[in-house]
Amino acid sequence: MLTSWRTISLLQKTTSRFIKRSKTYADVRYNSQALQNHGVPGNKRKWMKRFVFVGAAGIGVYAWDRVYNAHALTRSIRTVYTASIIAADYKLNFSEKKADKIDALHQRVAQRLFKTIYKNGGLYIKMGQIIAMQSNNLPEAYGKAFQGMFDNAPQVEWEELQDIFKEQYGRPVEEVFASIEKRAAASASIAQVHRAVLPSGEKVAVKIQKPDVAKQMSWDLLVYKYMMYVYDKWIFHIPLYFTVDYVSERLRSEVDFTTEANNSEHAREGVEETDYLRDKIYIPKVYKEISGKRVMVTEWADGIPLYDQTALSEAGMSKKEILTNLFRFLAFQMFHSKQVHCDPHPGNILVRKNQAGLCQTVILDHGLYVFESEKFRKEFALLFTAAYSLDKKSILQVMDAWGIGQPELFANRMLNIPMDEEQPHTGEKIISKKEAFQQQLAERKKFIGFLQDCTRLPKELLMLGRCLMLIQKNNQNFGYPVNSIAVMAKVADKYTTDKPSPTWYQRLLSPIFWVFQHLFYPGNFRLPELTNDKK
């Protein structure tokens, strides 16, 4: 009996559903017929439905990207769009026929690029900083557009950081620190720093990763890879794509603060063990027991940022001493420890007086490091010692081993050594628009021929090249008070055991070169002794 009632109930439900569907179908047919009777064509109805469907899907994707994906898709689309417009603009308008409009072309491209980078934020800010530090190698419009790239990036509100603190500590942040300022003291591309005090009373800097960085990283690197491929293979034919995997790997390691803590600790130990660095360089201590992947706690270090030249002058800081300390530290890392800080831009360097009243350089942000092989370290050290002694043969030998097809370009741009026959002129030479275009075209051809064999280029050089250009730019900003090659060659020589014997003509020219240096550049080319002298 129970089975019969179940069967009857099932039949009733099925019949009811069938009747409802039939009514719905009939209504749809009736409404469709009514639309046809009112003169709405079938094709138009189809396109209306498609439009509604696509619009709804677009709104849904945008909402998902905004709420759950940290605008990563929107930023990627914005980047691809801007890069495509820039590529098309240069492809169509960078020509001899339009030489009189080249300056305007560079200006609008630089403005487009700056707006996109600043709006996207995150890792894009680092790209903007690279462009800013390369202003002397780029058209003037880029230098003007990117001159404010080292200012503080927009900071994230305190409430948005709470999930990261809970993920790190498993408890409210107020239980970890005696006090912590809710407004960031500094904000950079991927993180911001808050002042805090430990229960012990020690003042610390709490570096916390911005919440969106983890979600945006994969998207940003995917777009970077795509754009490098397109620019390399289809548009500019400049060898760029081979760098993608290595650069992406380095950037991924930078957002892991445990890696940064290890780098910082290693650098600190190296400085403390080296006589000529111990009192001149300072690396803040890391509190590893309360640091993790997305939060890092270090001791608070006061100082004047390297970019604030007015404050440095008012404090009586020596420009030469500041930069000598910086060059010695980086040379020590390049030619001895083999772990090199590759982000020495002015915002990551503070200057203060040590206990003896001497200038002391504080090095911050040890996330972006490169790790050298022993073979590369020896070749790199040889390059600098050869550069100082004007051993052109050894310089060319190293560059040939690295597959570099334009040694003059490499020496001029990265080492700041003039190897070509072109002599510097005094004053500003007035040239025509057509001549300016020809110069830019020649520079582009040089760069294309720069990498003769990408398979032989040491990957370390990709990041070290950035490091060298950054510190050369710092030197330029201060008016070149230090001969960086002389300072770094002295350190390289200290850690080079297999030194080649000088040739007869090097011995012959050495006294002449010495007289030339001291007559025209008194004190600037002298190899400084690696001591803790208190000059």
Curated annotation (Swiss-Prot):
Disulfide bonds: none annotated. One of its GO terms (molecular function) is kinase activity. GO terms for cellular component: mitochondrion. Belongs to the protein kinase superfamily. ADCK protein kinase family. This is ABC1 family protein C10F6.14c. The lineage of its organism: Eukaryota, Fungi, Dikarya, Ascomycota, Taphrinomycotina.
